[in-house]
């Protein structure tokens, strides 16, 4: 038989520190459980054990504490974020059928040692742990699997006798002798004072054991200082040997058959995993069933509609319904359901396609769907407009939990409808569609409770149609121009590379941080921060600190900028140009926690515009023949939102008087009339204005604007003194977030902040920065979405040929026939400025040009 024994505390600890904090929507921490389960499942996959035992320490003192008062005396208690996960993990393991083993007076290591020592010679034991104490237990049929979580993924290193000899030069049992000499700071095992790891290993390799060392202490060839240390701490060495020796005879059950996994309690295990929102773990476990409902207990599984063959009569009956749920599988099939039946329409059949398109346009039928954007896209492709979509399950789930990893339909059914019984079906999509009604109902109830149903129906769903249209139209690009620009960049990159090699005096891989660090800080002797295990840091912050004094560093920074511009933006754009010469980016509504729209293939939000060369990229985005581009962006929208949310009179008055807010801020911070403010002062005030929005501190501000930390601190204090409303807002929003567990925008979009309850100071500080910033950034994102909807609808209402084609941050771009361009610019500005009524007027400037570069003005 194969026995797998897990050191529960050790692996849970490794998982906790190896994965960033994760929480459920209601704020329960789950990262340690998630990591532990991934490690356990990976171990089972690798080992294929016949039996599994999971051991844990107990809080009660052990025989080692009685032997030595100082044993583990320096151990801090578990962080509360980890401690709360321990009982939940044990409950989950028990539900899954694993045997948990504990024994008062003994540690998990002793239980592991006892189980491994009592297996028969023909059996095998695999010990999974996060520390090296168990290496002493290795023998021919006992191996140690050192488990860890790196970059969120489980890893294991296998230790047998050969590996221990290779790494340490000793046998497994001699690992105890090494610990006796060097001690163990984590367990507060004293060892011999002044003897470290290297010396301890060397002594045991040479002399085999502490017994042999002390029996021949006066004769062996060692330094006199080492001999003195060994003599002085002989008692401590032997005490440490006892403390470090794992007990092989703890009073626990050693019958392997008793550790064979029991059948899981499917409902209990699934219920726990659903409540922990661990849907991927649930999928990996392949449990045959789903959880029984937990709230309310009396709830019964809903009776699902059943699949029925499509007939013309049934379709007509469906079309007569006031509310229909449907799942758009592809351009080939669409699944419908109401309370009693599920239908599938074949969109390759012209009659059924025509009925479906008529159904989409029918304003009387309320439609609840899984994903509205693909439905809007299909409608637009066929020259119609989808009407009265009142629920988009994906977008609704996103609003309820914007930090979820995905919004997969099966996962959402498990999360929101745990009482739904999903039987195996030859038509899984029929089952999925049958669940839509219940799922939509649950999500709508939650959204209504959070006052977010209007956000879904008036912003997110209408926006999905706008984005579908933008993706369909795309933006024309100058392919030849991009190719020439890329070639020019290649020439400049090659020239910089040659110059860097010349200054370095050798050729090396500039893109390798390790090689670059050696060249800069060892060969050229540039001042370096402390070297780490992975080498010298050569990130942008480090290099920018050296750039003013060293030409090679300036060249390296420019090299990186041009290489990024070429690979990501030039070559990247060339890969995604369609047959029509246009780029059809995918716009995403569920990728960011603030509500901002993101884009992929390509990511148009990240086109670099701070450097002139980056701005040149805009020249390659064109209007089609006979068309022009209209570009409009908001003026300082986040500061205007801040003024409104903070109800800061000074800032509101400045904006409504059309004053230059940065000059006004500089006037207050530097205590002088606005007319005496210099460009440098205004620039620094601008950094303060926007820095405050993003929760910047004195240290970061000082680096951004090149002043001392004390000066930066004074700028921030003077700013908050003048804008007292902003200061008050910054304090109140954090306090409210701590009470509520979330912050929200003016339109009720939420971001949950479990970090505010963390015992980790850095995480708490991060949570506080987000609490201050998200209502501002999120409200600005909501406003630009509203503006997009208004522009799109007005262009349609006025029967214009102009089309909204791009959104980049606070900027909208419309492509319009030359004859419509002026009117389109007027429409865009008006709709952007009227998107939201606040105490501060929104301001938008529109410009027209043949290229994005020209239209940007």
Model-predicted segments: where are they?
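Function-dense linear segments that define catalytic or interfacial modules
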Residues: 337, 397-423, 428-430, 435, ...
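Conserved catalytic core of nucleic-acid polymerases
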Residues: 472, 570, 584-585, 589-592, ...
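Active-site palm subdomain of RNA-directed nucleic acid polymerases
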Residues: 447-459, 463, 783, 787-808, ...
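Active-site-proximal helix-loop-helix substrate-binding element of RNase H-like nuclease domains
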Residues: 99, 151-179, 299-302, 337-449, ...
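Conserved RNase H-like, two-metal-ion catalytic cores of nucleic-acid enzymes
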Residues: 3-4, 8, 14-53, 69-70, ...
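C-terminal polymerase-core module
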Residues: 491-498, 502-554, 721-769, 773-775, ...
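Conserved "right-hand" nucleotidyltransferase catalytic core of DNA-directed polymerases
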Residues: 233-353, 361, 365-366, 370, ...
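Extended two-metal-dependent nuclease catalytic cores across DNA- and RNA-processing enzymes
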Residues: 23, 73-252
